[in-house]
Amino acid sequence: MKVALILGAAVWPGGVPSPTLRRRTLHAAGLWHGGEVQALIACGGLGTHPPTEAEAMRRLLLSEGVPDAAIRIEGRSRNTHENILLARPLLADLGATEAVIVTDATHAPRARMIARRLGLRASSSSPSLRGSHLPTTLRQGLREIPATALALWRLRR
C-alpha cells in the first residue's frame, strides 16, 4: 500500500492554512483522488496558531472530498525529522509498503534522506510552485543548506 505523508507547514491566524500548507495538502488530495496513494497521513503539531498543522490539513482534505477513513493524523511533530519519525507507527498500522512524501521540491531531497535513514522506502511528490511568492521560495531553498547539514548531523548515529 502506498501512503502519502504530508509534511506540515504554518497555520495562520484563524486556523487558515498557509499557502505552503494548502499547496501540499491539495496536491496530496489529488494523489488520493487519482488512485496514486490509498491513504494520507497529515503530519504536524501545534505552531503559533491553532489548530495543529495536521488538523488544518485534515479539514482541508475533507473539504476536497477525501473521506475521513483515508486520513490519519500525526499531530505532535515540530520538524521534518519528527514528522517522519512519529508517522512511522501510523505507516506500520496501515501496512504501508511505501511512503510518498508530499512536500515542496526544495524540501523533498532532505525529507527523502531523513525517511531513508529512518528505514522507510520513500519517494516524493511535490506540488507546482507556480504562483508562489518568489522571495519565500528562495528563502525556503536557501534554508535547506543548513537544514540538510543539521539533519545529517542528527542522523549520524
Task: Locate each region found by the language model.
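A structural signal for short, hydrophobic/glycine-enriched beta-strand patches
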Residues: 1-141
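A transmembrane-helix-recognition feature enriched in membrane-embedded lipid enzymes
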Residues: 134-157
